[in-house]
Regions:
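Catalytic cores of nucleotide-sugar-dependent glycosyltransferases that transfer UDP/GDP/TDP-activated
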Residues: 1-245
Length: 245
């Protein structure tokens, strides 16, 4: 089972052992010809249906799985929204601030500063009592921030292959408000464990209904689709399929 990108594919024609290659997103379109070359000798697995490339043959999609015990359920949140992720334009930190301001909600921002110019020019001037930046969070801080939030804001501007923070939030029972891009429609069932929106104004509007989302259902749905046990079970079925076909 290859998780190491395309380099081990060069061995797939030299061995009789079946090979599964999980593609964790494409760093560049230029690596596609390499994957295409080994279409018949490696069995590709995507981490979301949205991250598939039409020119490749896929055996299946297996979603990333998390240890659900690392995330405890919080039934009664505090009165704030959370942005959790890299401080980068693609992640939508500035859009999260706009959403919070328009909704008249407190926003806590947690994450590493990946784009310093973006942070110091666009984000830092917006910080106030209402918009708070707490920096990178360790696992315990992450669990507390996510569990106590009314909602996680995830206003991405790119086709994200899989949103780990979205699943982590739901495992805490916290609903998510996400921009409808990439894998988000596979993670979020609109109106059930969060909301899919197209822009800032759409996010502001659905926040009026965030209280209608049952936090217990958020966790239950995340466990059923995105637990480590579910991921291991799905891969085990693929191993059996290859070994006994």
């Amino acid at each position: 089972h290859n998780h190491f990108d395309f380099l081990p594919l060069s061995y797939s024609k030299l061995i009789k052992t079946p090979m599964i290659t999980t593609i964790h997103g494409f760093s560049s379109e230029r690596i596609l010809p390499v994957y295409q070359k080994y279409n018949q000798t490696s069995n590709y697995v995507s981490i979301s249906n949205s991250d598939r490339h039409a020119s490749l043959n896929y055996l299946s999609t297996v979603y990333n799985g998390l240890n659900v015990e690392d995330f405890s359920f919080t039934g009664k949140p505090e009165d704030y929204l959370l942005f959790f992720g890299r401080i980068h334009p693609h992640k939508g930190t500035l859009e999260a601030i706009e959403i919070a301001k328009k909704a008249n909600k407190k926003l806590i921002i947690a994450g590493i500063i990946q784009d310093e110019a973006y942070f110091f020019e666009k984000i830092e001037p917006q910080l106030s009592d209402q918009i708070e930046f707490v920096g990178a969070a360790n696992p315990e801080q992450r669990k507390k921030l996510m569990g106590n939030a009314q909602a996680l804001l995830h206003p991405i501007s790119f086709e994200e292959p899989f949103g780990l923070s979205v699943v982590e939030s739901m495992l805490c029972g916290t609903p998510v408000v996400v921009f409808n891009k990439g894998s988000m429609p596979e993670l979020v069932q609109n109106g059930i464990n969060g909301f899919l929106v197209n822009d800032v104004d759409g996010a502001v509007e659905v926040l009026k209904s965030i209280h209608t989302i049952e936090r217990k259902i958020c966790r239950e749905m995340a466990i059923s689709k995105f637990s480590a046990e579910k991921m291991a079970s799905d891969y085990f079925k693929l191993y059996e399929q290859l070994l006994f076909r």
